[in-house]
């Protein structure tokens, strides 16, 4: 069963990223399912740390991007969602290619939400697990 209250296409979701950090990092929404939102991000000079690996902050940015947009899709007119807490556990390095973030709800309350975002490499291996808490305002 679809949980989203706002009904946007992937093209509309991606258009919201124009001229933002999301676009600068190359993050692209790729799937909007009944209760899941996915995006891809390149692992290249924009997202590397100085030693040629995916920067943990880039993984966190992907996670917060997904969780915040998922939270927004659950709001009604006059409401917004803001992040309150982000936790990231890094499991394995990635040096090139793309990573895919998969965002699903853990808790959906009237005033707060919790999201799990798992980042996978191109071989489908879990690279990072994040949890984002959000507050619903309005």
From Swiss-Prot:
Active-site residues, as the UniProt record annotates them: 64
Subcellular location, principal: cytoplasm
Claim: Hydrolase is one of the keywords in the record: yes
GO biological process: enterobactin biosynthetic process
GO molecular function terms noted in the UniProt entry: 1,4-dihydroxy-2-naphthoyl-CoA thioesterase activity
EC numbers: 3.1.2.-
UniProt pathway annotation: Siderophore biosynthesis; enterobactin biosynthesis
Protein biosynthesis listed as a keyword: no
Coiled-coil region list: none
GO CC terms, sorted: cytosol
Key words, A-Z: Cytoplasm, Hydrolase
Subcellular localization: Cytoplasm
Gene3D superfamilies the record matches: Hotdog Thioesterase
HAMAP family (alphabetical): Thioesterase_EntH
Similarity comment text for this entry: Belongs to the thioesterase PaaI family.
Function according to Swiss-Prot or TrEMBL: Required for optimal enterobactin synthesis. Acts as a proofreading enzyme that prevents EntB misacylation by hydrolyzing the thioester bound existing between EntB and wrongly charged molecules.
Subunit structure: Homotetramer. Dimer of dimers. Interacts specifically with the aryl carrier protein (ArCP) domain of EntB.
UniProt name for this protein: Proofreading thioesterase EntH
Organism per entry: Citrobacter rodentium (strain ICC168)
């Amino acid at each position: 069963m679809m949980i989203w209250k706002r009904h946007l296409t992937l093209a509309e979701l991606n258009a919201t990223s124009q001229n933002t950090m999301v676009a600068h990092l190359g993050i692209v929404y790729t799937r909007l399912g009944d209760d899941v939102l996915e995006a891809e991000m390149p692992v290249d000079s924009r997202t590397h740390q100085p030693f040629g690996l995916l920067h943990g902050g880039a993984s966190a940015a992907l996670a917060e991007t997904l969780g915040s947009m998922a939270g927004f899709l659950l709001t009604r007119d006059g409401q917004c969602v803001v992040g309150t807490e982000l936790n990231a556990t890094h499991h394995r390095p990635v040096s090139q290619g793309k990573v895919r973030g998969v965002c699903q709800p853990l808790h959906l309350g009237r005033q707060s939400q919790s999201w799990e975002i798992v980042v996978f490499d191109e071989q489908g291996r879990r690279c990072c697990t994040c949890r984002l808490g959000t507050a619903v305002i309005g």
